[in-house]
């Protein structure tokens, strides 16, 4: 026993380093038609052209807060994988209870 806990790597035992794509401006992946479909589902008939960027900004800030809370739950449990329950608890903490995923 080396006392490193579970999943620790010893010296010289590191895995191969992979090149990771730099993530930037991925919010543009939420396309105009996707936003339009969400609005249609919500009962919206006509959409102003300025709505799309505003929607992306609001969605980004919402997801940042939910993910921050979910990662906090994950780190507290000493895990490296965010589970669906972490997200459910993060949403519940923000007053947006989600049913159907346990918890």
Curated annotation (Swiss-Prot):
Named from the GO MF annotations, one term is:
structural constituent of chromatin
What segment(s) does the record annotate as region Disordered?
Answer: 1-20
Sorted alphabetically, the keyword list is: Acetylation, Chromosome, DNA-binding, Methylation, Nucleosome core, Nucleus
Its annotated compartments are: Nucleus; Chromosome
Coarsely, its chief localization is nucleus
A Pfam family per the record: CENP-T_C
Q: For this protein, what post-translational modification is recorded in UniProt?
A: Glutarylation at Lys-92 (H4K91glu) destabilizes nucleosomes by promoting dissociation of the H2A-H2B dimers from nucleosomes.
DNA-binding segment(s): 17-21
Which stretches are tagged as biased composition: Gly residues? 1-14
The source's domain of life comes to: Eukaryota
Report the Gene3D superfamilies cross-referenced here: Histone, subunit A
Gene Ontology CC:
nucleosome; nucleus
Chain positions found as N6-acetyl-N6-methyllysine? 6, 13
Record PTM N6-methyllysine, positions in chain = 6, 9, 13
Q: Which SUPFAM superfamilies match?
A: Histone-fold (SSF47113)
- Subunit structure, per the record? The nucleosome is a histone octamer containing two molecules each of H2A, H2B, H3 and H4 assembled in one H3-H4 heterotetramer and two H2A-H2B heterodimers. The octamer wraps approximately 147 bp of DNA.
Q: What does this protein do?
A: Core component of nucleosome. Nucleosomes wrap and compact DNA into chromatin, limiting DNA accessibility to the cellular machineries which require DNA as a template. Histones thereby play a central role in transcription regulation, DNA repair, DNA replication and chromosomal stability. DNA accessibility is regulated via a complex set of post-translational modifications of histones, also called histone code, and nucleosome remodeling.
Family label: Belongs to the histone H4 family.
The protein here is known as Histone H4.2
